[in-house]
């Protein structure tokens, strides 16, 4: 099972009107395919504790795609990144075949710095759901082109072979 870590960095350079307790960055970490069973297994092997318990905010996401009760990473990632359901295998496109805007793109439009980090290919479905609009998660080279044309400030991940 691949676990994907996605980080969204949003430095808030708003100025003096900013409250002192406003965070400088927001980091969203997604354990792709990770559920309660995987968390429990981690707890059982580590004296019934995980570092997740130390995080100030954690959450779970229960999703299903438009066409299936069992979602895939593309549809789940699109739902998380864009706030709208789509079909399995589809990234950043809704049921009306319209391109969706992700939270990362909205932050870019508002002057925030953004980044993605993946411990798998950076063009895999979950990280790609934050920048790609394409009808198949398997079109890796086209997804790589969309990443290279994006305004993402920083990205790290595998998948060099897809950037021709």
Residue spans for each PLM region:
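N-terminal catalytic scaffold of extracellular/periplasmic and nuclease hydrolases
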Residues: 18-164
């Amino acid at each position: 099972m691949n676990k994907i870590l996605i980080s969204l960095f949003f430095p808030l350079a708003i100025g003096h009107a900013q409250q002192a307790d406003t965070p400088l960055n927001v980091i969203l970490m997604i354990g792709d395919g990770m559920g309660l069973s995987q968390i429990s297994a981690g707890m059982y092997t580590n004296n019934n504790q995980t570092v997740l318990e130390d995080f100030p905010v954690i959450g779970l996401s229960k999703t299903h795609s438009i066409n299936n009760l069992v979602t895939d990473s593309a549809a789940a990632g699109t739902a998380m990144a864009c706030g709208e359901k789509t079909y399995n295998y589809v990234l950043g496109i809704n049921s009306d075949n319209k391109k969706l805007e992700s939270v990362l793109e909205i932050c870019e439009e508002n002057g925030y710095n953004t980044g993605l980090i993946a411990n798998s290919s950076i063009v895999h479905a979950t990280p790609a759901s934050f920048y790609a609009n394409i009808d198949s998660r398997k079109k890796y080279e086209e997804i790589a082109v969309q990443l290279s044309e994006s305004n993402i400030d920083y990205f790290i991940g595998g998948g060099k072979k897809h950037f021709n």
